[in-house]
Amino acid sequence: MKFTFHKVTLKKRFPLAISRGVRYNSENLFVCYEKDGHIGWGEAAPGNSEGAATAEAVQEALENFIATGIEGFSIQELYDRAREMKIPPCAYVALDTAFWDWTAKKAQLPLRQLLGFSKPHTPTSVTIGINPPEVIKERVPLLLEGTTVQSLKIKLGSPEGIDADKTMFEQVVESTKKYPVKLRVDANGGWDVNQAQHMMQWLADRKVDYIEQPLKEGDEAGLKTLFKSRPLPIYVDESCRFSQNIPSFAAHVDGVNMKLMKCGGITEALRIIGTARAHGLKTMIGCMSESSVAIAAAAAMTGGIDHIDLDSHYNLAPDPAHGAPLINGVTLPPEIPGHGAYLKEEFYA
């Protein structure tokens, strides 16, 4: 058994601005797990809100975990032990996805088939961040021209208020007239209840598909108020980190958005899917600042998920990994054993 770590800076084509700030690049940690002639790849995207802010912190956490002894345990047992040890989810995800990739390769199956999912078929959204109208006008064609993108997710919740949100949204509508895309909105918790009630009706009148995380994480009382008279489906993102979070808000939302970096990997994502379904909720899977390695791992589950938002690797210049192309609007890893992605050798550190 051998673990190799590679630290890589991911540079974005376009900065991504949301209600909480702007990201220009990220320094991710890639893990290569080798055993019995097979290799598994995993990726961690550190974040201040996720418990490990740097690639160095991620590597230290993983090395400490590995040093406790991991031979002879199942993937699920190792995940549960990592949670007990309080290993940051955005760190442990690299091991979890590497273990699943390795297991699928050993079984000679595509990961999605090992997990019991059909081939991905639902188109992914591509995201545009908070920007002034003149930037939106320039950026929309750069995101959509010559692509097979079918849905655009618009980040709102501007620090400048809902008037700025409306101005930006109207420019998006104008700039997308020549492209056959559906529009979705993610406020990243940037509104209070009154703003959310107003904006949801305003957006519903403009044929938006759904609204994601209208209120701050933890505002279950506000969600209850919104849900009673919602004109749009409500999905929560920041409010849903683990499967055990779901019962607290299940009666007041229409669906949940899971992310591997939030929950710690495929192992917990499967539990989130099952728990959401048990509560009659729809599912979405999203991403953070990730390359094709983490995206391909997430895409292995998309045959059983309602909405897909796996696009961060399309905003990299360049993507240091290979394996999650956009085909007819769908993020579609190759049908080969494992999740299908790997770090390119020129990015080995």
Swiss-Prot record:
Cofactor binding notes: Binds 1 Mg(2+) ion per subunit.
Keyword Magnesium tagged: yes
Residues annotated for substrate binding in this entry: T127, K153, I154, K155, K259, D309, L310, D311
Residues reported in the UniProt entry to bind Mg(2+): D186, E212, D237
Pfam assignment, any one: MR_MLE_C
Keywords assigned by UniProt, alphabetized: Isomerase, Magnesium, Metal-binding
Transmembrane segments: none
SMART domains reported for this sequence: MR_MLE
Protein name in UniProt: Hydrophobic dipeptide epimerase
